[in-house]
């Protein structure tokens, strides 16, 4: 008789946080980066939900739906359980424990034979109702959880959260959150590097390279990528003016009613002729992202991305982050993105988190 196969239930969620009302930072968020990590932590509130089925307090989270990524599930589940539309921030951690221990105060993750729940967590921030409305078509609907699933939510300090959380694994995740804040996670701004979707081959295309379009398969990839980009609430869209880059972000621009800024210095020809000028144009987008505190998505070409990576690796806070910016062509697959979280330091921009963003095409 064959052994029973282990079942893994995939889930996702996050620690939703905000600046405490009345705090200096809440009154002027631009001052956050000038505060110490402890001052930031003292000014932060996190959201905890109560599950009547288990009579416990935990982070908002839930199971993945069919054809859904972890990041999309995290944003959707947080919205369903808290009523707050959010955008994702730096990644936190993964937690795994036997399903039989769901709802128990202490969880043990060492049993590799039992049916298991595997959950990924992010930092997440509430967004405005207006931003949520702009994202609706790209992200999809979010329906509030039934009172039988979640019957209470509270916003508490980090110190209070340690006392209220029911589970050891949730307290461990809170410790990771504190570490993230200490390295700048609460002031990090998000820049998404998008590689255009699959385009017609140079060999078969009879027009100019600037007018070479994406393929029908590429269009499907671009459409699916919109759902993933929406998880980060990109309110600024920028692109090389060449057609394949425009087409990759075009539907997202239409869905969110956000205009696309064309950056001539980010075309393949411009980069080949003046790579330093291309970097200065990209560097200006980093500055604008930090100053505006808005998420920016920039669509570019393979060789341009490789050139930008050469500079960005030097901005990474850790060597293992720099290794995620591949030094060998093609650098990243077509129709995907890299999500960079950047903080402003006296020495200049510093990248503290990098996430690969890939769509599910079905």
Regions found by a protein language model. Name each.
Residues 62, 186-274, 306, 316-319, ...:
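Active-site-proximal alpha-helix that buttresses catalytic centers in soluble enzyme cores
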Residues 85-95, 258-264:
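A short coil-to-beta-strand element that immediately follows conserved catalytic motifs
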Residues 96-139:
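Active-site-adjacent beta-strand/loop module that shapes the phosphate/pyrophosphate-binding cleft
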Residues 55-56, 133-195, 201:
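Nudix hydrolase/Nudix homology domain
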Residues 183, 283-348:
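Active-site-adjacent alpha-helix immediately C-terminal to a catalytic or transition-state-stabilizing loop
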Residues 36-87, 205-212:
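Conserved Nudix-box catalytic region and its N-terminal flanking loop in Nudix hydrolases
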Residues 2-59, 192-196:
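N-terminal strand-loop-strand
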Residues 166, 171, 175-183, 187-189, ...:
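Non-catalytic terminal regions with compositionally biased, polar/charged low complexity
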